[in-house]
């Protein structure tokens, strides 16, 4: 869809040229059509009132919650962030810090992660490099 048709479509809901330009600026990029479709489907949602839908659509634009920024993708973004952190801070291999309970080896691959509340210590995930036994501490 070209810019003229896109503007015409947005003018149905956002009469002011300033608002249309703002939406086009906020959604600029390769997935612009997907983001505008998301705005329009939010406005046309039959399960809520038109005013509520319009308010939701405006909030999505203002808070950059279009596309991958939408809160529904938050768990997936968290997983990707953890994977990226793993790449920058990989496993540590240490001798003598931990000992395998199965084969008594001291070459252990381990990492720590905060799995409980902040006032609790981090959980250590360990794996023996000799017998591949895994455990947590």
Curated annotation (Swiss-Prot):
Positions of TFIIS-type zinc fingers: 85-136
GO biological process, one term: DNA-templated transcription
Keyword ATP-binding: no
Disulfide bonds: none
Sites where the protein binds Zn(2+): 89, 103, 128, 131
Key words, A-Z: Metal-binding, Zinc, Zinc-finger
Listed GO MF terms: nucleic acid binding; zinc ion binding
Family label: Belongs to the IIV-6 349L family.
Protein name: Putative transcription elongation factor S-II-like protein 055R
Species for this entry: Invertebrate iridescent virus 3
Lineage, broadest ranks: Viruses, Varidnaviria, Bamfordvirae, Nucleocytoviricota, Megaviricetes
């Amino acid at each position: 869809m070209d810019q003229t048709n896109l503007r015409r479509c947005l003018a149905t809901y956002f009469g002011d040229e300033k608002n249309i330009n703002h939406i086009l600026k906020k959604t600029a990029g390769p997935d612009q059509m997907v983001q505008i479709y998301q705005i329009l489907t939010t406005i046309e949602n039959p399960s809520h009132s038109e005013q509520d839908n319009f308010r939701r659509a405006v909030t999505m634009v203002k808070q950059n919650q279009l596309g991958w920024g939408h809160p529904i993708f938050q768990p997936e973004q968290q997983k990707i962030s953890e994977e990226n952190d793993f790449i920058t801070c990989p496993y540590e291999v240490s001798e003598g810090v931990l000992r395998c309970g199965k084969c008594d080896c001291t070459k252990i691959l381990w990492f720590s992660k905060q799995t409980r509340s902040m006032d609790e210590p981090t959980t250590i995930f360990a794996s023996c490099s000799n017998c591949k036994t895994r455990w947590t501490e």
